[in-house]
């Protein structure tokens, strides 16, 4: 039957969980390992417990900081899918690189990684277009507020955008200008700079350990 509960890592973004709660899903938060990924044994045990209690769980796993799952977690996720448990992966931190996570659905919010007002997506095997609403004044105001925040980063502009976002839970197409900005963004160069920063950070850590 339709899923009615969600298994998530403790270390995850609440904005990815709230929509499920608004749909009435019961949320089970599980511990993560040293790599911030779901603990594989805890996940397997939680899924078994959900089934014993008559729940129909789904799994939301997150590639936090771009970290990929361990081979053990990959096997647990594969088994979950074989058992008919939907697996959703939050690739907000990792969409610039390939993913090892076996999943049915991919969700990404680009503005958490890129200096853009919006553009997010849900990628799935089935057609989800009927779930997309129509932009209205609330969405226009939110886009404008996010632009003001990007130009003038402060608590006031941040709170203005976040307060408007609280009233905009229905997915709608992105603003045309925001879409054009994303399509024109040099993702390859940005990815190169991320790798460069990562290498510099790791090098600094090695020096600090000596």
Could you tell me what each predicted segment is?
Residues 1-50:
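Conserved PLP-anchoring active-site segment centered on the Schiff-base-forming lysine
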Residues 16-18, 76, 201:
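Residues within well-ordered alpha-helices
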Residues 25, 55-56, 173:
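Pyridoxal 5′-phosphate
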Residues 60, 129-210:
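PLP-dependent aminotransferase class I/II
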Residues 20, 78-81, 205:
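A generic structural signal for well-ordered alpha-helical segments
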Residues 36-130:
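Active-site phosphate-binding strand-loop segment of PLP-dependent enzymes
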